[in-house]
A protein has these predicted regions:
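Hydrophobic/basic alpha-helical segments
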Residues: 1-331
Length: 331
């Protein structure tokens, strides 16, 4: 371990790694990589993150036969996974296994209520936590935002109790550590969300800003945010999406993100060819399609000035982008 130039004593490890290490999840994924072969045999999608395994399968909710076949596929796949884990000294945690059926809120609710995992029946949930994000049955993220607001307000109340003993700078540090980080975590998923969802988070940020600035609850919030140089929640979401886009275009993001955006190359020699634009795919469903990264990222990227797009590094891009969004928010 190395901290500020100081190194700990070297110790040889004959097996395993310390809990919480960066290497731990990678080694676990290498060990369990055969699970991917099992899942692919059933034509299912999957995500592996350390010991968290997610299986995905789409089906027509209006077709009883298709739904029954999908249930059979999932149960057979999980049965094979359970068998492989038992043979390789691992255990499938049935108590933490969840079933989430995602569908449009404009369609009838699918009748799938449970699946069989070994001899344990897993009932359908109305929400599931996905690496810190609460997914609901319509991907509205309403439950996630409510959870974030509840946690952030809890910490804000605790900070408020000791505010009289803190300087503004110390208060700002605590707010960033316990509140802002929660508002910003995975906030790119909220792009295109209904106004009432964004306003829930904005009210939390407003409370945090007034606490840092020592302003009363009735104080107008725009001057406070401007003085603190804080981007409002909506602009913070746009900032995160554009940052991911910049990284994807400069080979600094995972391939699964880079593959979602395509540079715009006109067939004729047009002035737009020098503007570093991205192709915007056509979508059929506005409420869901426009929120997809493959659609939202090009739209916002095409709107920002060229000098921001041509930034030479991530730090320069972030600085220029924040200045641009700040002017838009408070002009």
């Amino acid at each position: 371990m190395s901290i500020r130039g100081a190194r700990s004593v070297t110790r040889s490890l004959s097996c395993g790694v310390p809990q919480g290490s960066v290497l731990g999840p990678i080694l676990y994924l290498l060990y369990t990589s055969p699970l991917g072969d099992i899942v692919r045999q059933y034509n299912m999608g999957y995500h592996f993150y350390a010991d968290d395994t997610q299986l995905y399968l789409s089906f027509n909710s209006l077709s009883g036969d298709d739904q029954a076949y999908s249930v059979s596929q999932v149960e057979s796949c999980v049965r094979d996974i359970d068998r492989w884990m038992s043979c390789n000294k691992l255990k499938l945690n049935r108590d933490k296994t969840e079933l989430l059926v995602i569908s449009s809120k404009y369609r009838p609710r699918p009748s799938l209520d449970s699946i069989l995992v070994g001899d344990h029946r897993v009932e359908r949930s109305d929400k599931a936590r996905n690496i810190g994000v609460v997914f609901d049955e319509t991907l509205s993220l309403d439950k996630h935002v409510s959870s974030v607001c509840k946690s952030a307000l809890f910490h804000l109340r605790n900070i408020a109790k000791i505010r009289m003993y803190l300087t503004s700078e110390s208060t700002k540090t605590l707010v960033h550590a316990y509140v802002t980080c929660r508002l910003d975590n995975c906030n790119s998923l909220l792009l295109g969300s209904p106004e009432y969802i964004i306003q829930k988070l904005q009210r939390v940020q407003n409370c945090a800003a007034r606490l840092v600035a020592g302003q009363p609850r009735a104080a107008h919030i725009r001057p406070v945010l401007k003085e603190l140089h804080w981007l409002p929640v909506e602009q913070r979401i746009t900032f995160k999406v554009l940052l991911l886009t910049f990284k994807a275009l400069n080979n600094l993001a995972p391939p699964y993100l880079s593959q979602l955006i395509v540079p715009y190359n006109p067939t004729r020699n047009l002035r737009s060819a020098s503007k570093h634009l991205l192709e915007v795919p056509n979508v059929r469903l506005k409420s869901y399609g426009d929120r997809a990264f493959s659609v939202a990222a090009p739209k916002h990227w095409n709107d920002i000035p060229l000098d921001i797009k041509l930034s030479g590094s991530v730090d320069v891009f972030k600085s220029r982008l924040k200045t641009y969004l700040f002017r838009l928010a408070f002009s």
